[in-house]
C-alpha cells in the first residue's frame, strides 16, 4: 500500500537532467549539488540515481559522511567548508574536499596535525559579498595556502554568482571578469556556474559546473520552467482525496471562514497540510492536479488538510490521487501562486512525507 502524502522521485528524470546539463556544458565536469537532503528528494536516493555524476556538492560534513557511509565514491565538496578543527581528520579519512572562504579556516589548517593534506577550493568573493576572500585579500591568502603543508596542491578556485538567475543582469559578467582576472594563469580547477550559470551563461561553465535546482528538473529563473530546457521534474508530490462533500452557495469552509462559495459546488478534502510542509499561506486559487485537470485550493491550508473546489459536476471520488506539484503541474507554477520560489517548496517537506523512488 502506497503511503500518502508521498514524494515520488523519478530516477529517469534525474538521469535526463544530468544528460541535459552535460550537453549544455560539454567541456565541464558536473558536481551535482545534493545539499538539504538532495533538495528534498532524499540525499542518498539522489546520489545513487546520479552515480555517473563526477562529484557532489554538500553544505554540511554530516551530509558528506552519509554519502560515504552509503558507498558513494565520487568527489565530495563541502560548499561552506569545514566549521571546526575536529572536522579536518574526517575530511582526510573520508577523502572529502573543502571550500576555504575565511581566515579562521586557514588558521585551523595551519595548526592541524594531519596524516595527509586536504584538497581545498579557495572561494573568491567576486561580488556576492556573502562568503569568500576579497580581491584585495586574494594574493596573500593564496600564498598562505600554498605554503601550508596541510593543503594539497594545486589549490582549486571557485566563486558564486549573485544574479545569474537574471539573464539580462550585467552583474554576472562583472563577477566573471573579476574572478578570471584574479585567477589567470594559476593551476587547479575552476568552478563558477550554478544552475543558472550552466543554463544561461555559457562562458561561466569552467572546469566544473555546480547545478542544484536544475538537477531536479526545475528552472532557477522566475517565470521560466525547467521543461523549456528539456529538464523533467524529478519529484511528484502526491496525496489523495479523503472526502468529497456537497457544498451550498454562500457556505464558508475552513478556519476563519476565509472562503465562501458563490454557487453550489463539490469540495474535496486533500490529506496534506502545513504539517507536511505545504505552505499555510497558499492563497485561494493555488492549483492542484486531480484526474487530468487543475482545480483551485479554497479556504485556509490547515495542519493536515487542504480543501479544493472540484466543481458542481465533478465525479472525483474519495481515494483519488492528488498531485500538489510535479510533471503535470510544475512546481515553478505553484511557487509563483504562493509568492515564493520552487527551492523553498521542495526543501521544506517534513518527515511526514514519505520519499519514495518511483
Curated annotation (Swiss-Prot):
Assigned GO CC terms: cytosol
Protein name as annotated: Alanine racemase
Pathway annotation: Amino-acid biosynthesis; D-alanine biosynthesis; D-alanine from L-alanine: step 1/1
Active-site annotation: 35 (proton acceptor), 255 (proton acceptor)
EC number: 5.1.1.1
Catalysed reaction, written as an equation: L-alanine = D-alanine
Entry's family note: Belongs to the alanine racemase family.
Alphabetical keyword list: Isomerase, Pyridoxal phosphate
Bilayer-spanning residue ranges: none
GO biological process, one term: D-alanine biosynthetic process
Function summary: Catalyzes the interconversion of L-alanine and D-alanine. May also act on other amino acids.
NCBIfam families, per the entry: alr
Single GO MF descriptor: pyridoxal phosphate binding
Gene for this chain: alr
Residues carrying N6-(pyridoxal phosphate)lysine: 35
Class of enzymatic activity (EC top level): isomerase
InterPro entries: Ala_racemase, Ala_racemase/Decarboxylase_C, Ala_racemase_C, Ala_racemase_N, Ala_racemase_pyridoxalP-BS, PLP-binding_barrel
Cofactor section: pyridoxal 5'-phosphate
SMART domains xref list: Ala_racemase_C (SM01005)
Binding-site residues, substrate: 130, 303
Highest taxon, organism lineage: Bacteria
Amino acid at each position: 500500500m502506497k503511503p500518502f502524502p508521498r514524494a515520488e522521485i523519478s530516477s529517469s528524470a534525474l538521469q535526463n537532467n544530468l544528460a541535459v546539463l552535460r550537453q549544455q556544458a560539454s567541456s565541464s565536469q558536473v558536481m551535482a549539488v545534493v545539499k538539504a537532503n538532495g533538495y528534498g528528494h532524499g540525499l542518498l536516493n539522489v546520489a545513487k540515481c546520479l552515480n555517473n555524476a563526477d562529484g557532489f556538492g554538500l553544505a554540511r560534513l554530516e551530509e558528506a559522511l552519509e554519502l560515504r557511509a552509503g558507498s558513494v565514491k565520487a568527489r565530495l565538496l563541502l560548499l561552506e567548508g569545514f566549521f571546526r578543527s575536529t572536522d579536518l581528520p574526517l575530511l582526510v579519512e573520508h577523502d572529502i574536499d573543502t571550500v576555504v572562504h575565511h581566515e579562521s579556516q586557514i588558521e585551523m589548517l595551519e595548526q592541524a596535525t594531519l596524516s595527509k593534506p586536504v584538497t581545498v577550493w579557495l572561494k573568491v568573493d567576486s561580488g556576492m559579498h556573502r562568503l569568500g576572500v576579497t580581491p584585495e585579500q586574494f594574493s596573500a591568502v593564496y600564498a598562505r595556502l600554498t605554503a601550508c603543508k596541510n593543503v594539497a596542491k594545486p589549490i582549486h578556485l571557485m566563486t558564486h554568482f549573485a544574479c545569474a538567475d537574471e539573464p539580462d543582469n550585467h552583474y554576472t559578467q562583472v563577477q566573471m571578469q573579476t574572478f578570471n582576472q584574479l585567477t589567470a594563469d594559476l593551476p587547479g580547477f575552476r568552478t563558477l556556474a550554478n544552475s543558472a550559470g550552466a543554463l544561461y551563461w555559457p562562458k561561466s561553465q569552467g572546469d566544473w559546473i555546480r547545478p542544484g535546482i536544475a538537477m531536479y528538473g526545475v528552472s532557477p529563473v522566475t517565470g521560466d520552467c525547467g521543461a523549456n530546457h528539456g529538464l523533467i521534474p524529478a519529484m511528484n508530490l502526491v496525496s489523495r482525496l479523503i472526502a468529497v462533500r456537497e457544498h451550498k452557495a454562500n457556505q464558508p469552509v475552513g478556519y476563519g471562514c476565509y472562503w465562501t462559495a458563490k454557487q453550489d459546488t463539490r469540495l474535496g478534502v486533500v490529506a496534506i497540510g502545513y504539517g507536511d510542509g505545504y505552505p499555510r499561506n497558499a492563497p485561494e486559487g493555488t492549483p492542484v492536479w486531480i484526474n487530468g485537470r487543475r482545480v483551485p485550493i479554497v479556504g485556509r491550508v490547515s495542519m493536515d488538510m487542504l480543501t479544493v473546489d472540484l466543481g458542481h459536476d465533478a465525479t472525483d471520488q474519495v481515494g483519488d490521487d492528488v498531485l500538489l506539484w510535479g510533471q503535470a503541474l510544475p512546481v515553478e507554477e505553484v511557487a509563483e501562486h504562493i509568492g515564493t520560489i520552487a527551492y523553498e517548496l521542495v526543501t521544506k517537506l517534513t518527515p511526514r512525507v514519505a520519499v519514495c523512488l518511483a
